[in-house]
Amino acid sequence: MNPYWLEGLAAQTPALSGEHGADVVVIGAGLCGASAALALAEAGLNPLWLERGFVSVGASGRNAGFVLQGTAERYSRAIGVMGRERARRVHGWSRENHLAMADAVQRFGIDCGYQRRGSLQLACAPEEEAELLESAARLAEDGFAADVWSGADLPACYRDAGFHVGVHLPDDGELHPARFVRGLAKAAVEAGAVLHEGTAITALDAQGAGDVTIRTSSAAGTGTVRASLVVVCTNAYAGEILPFFADKVDPVRGQMLATAPVAPLFGCPVYADHGYDYWRQDEAGRIVLGGWRNLDPASEVGTAEVLHDGIQARMVEFLHRFPALREAPITHRWSGTMGFSRDGLPICGAVPGAPGVMAAVGFTGHGFGFAYLAGQAMAQLVVEGRSDFVDAFSARRFAV
């Protein structure tokens, strides 16, 4: 298994061992953890930052690199589940997240191939077409750009593959996910964050704010950190160190592949079949394709990053629906573990039953739609004691 985005990457900072103290500890060096560490460092708090593997090695470096607005549900469904006003507010948070990420690319000069070409949602069946059209109408009514493409408006490559209707969302974007996260990490360390990669958390004992003990293990030996506050940004793995999340965030595996570079074909990231199928063509010309876990959902649960032969084969069959891709060599295959919350929304803020510990997890396959802002919100919670974002996605909604 060879994740395309992670080629040649490894830990660049020493593992932690021995006894340490810290005012604030951040656990996890994906997008959310990098954002939190950066914001805390810029606030002058110099957080101690721990990562089991290396920066971006988890889902943040194994996804398709989409920067999308909204949740995993189409907007019309989101309205049906959470109500019009809350759906509008949540969608607005994801738009703000994208704008903040774009600002970070510019501010820190991150070379990550960021582009804002929009995204395209395609329908695979008549009922999905109706849902797409309804979502486009509701988005427009609520002030979000959405353009219906059908007939000649839909590019020929999609019509030739059997698609008839799509909705283009012009405010969405794309990037090289690992490069973006590592660019944030570099900025965080330069601002004062103290990063230790290759450092696994073996225990977290929260006696109260100001009295949290973290025990670690690494190639350098065991370690103990006594912290005043801890920010957990481990998404799918949160339940391993915080029992509160064991029945609230499920680890769900996603299959991915990439081809050798081919001639330009797709103009923006694409979602189809209610988001179960997704692909894009990156700046190097490679087709990066993922999804199809609905073919065998029971087996795609868990944290083992393994390939599913049947799903991988189905992904190749799908590629061959596009004549220009029938001879494209597959150069990379990999999987990654996402954290799906029980209600499809991020879970942020103080962790019930763990005083002194806060978390931002459960991004449900849309980490690049929410996690950057979530990390900033966690830092705001530490520094100022409150955050509107945290209020919107508080873990308290499960503590009833």
How would you describe each model-predicted region?
Residues 2-7, 73-79, 103-183, 191:
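Flavin (FAD/FMN) cofactor-binding and adjacent substrate-gating region
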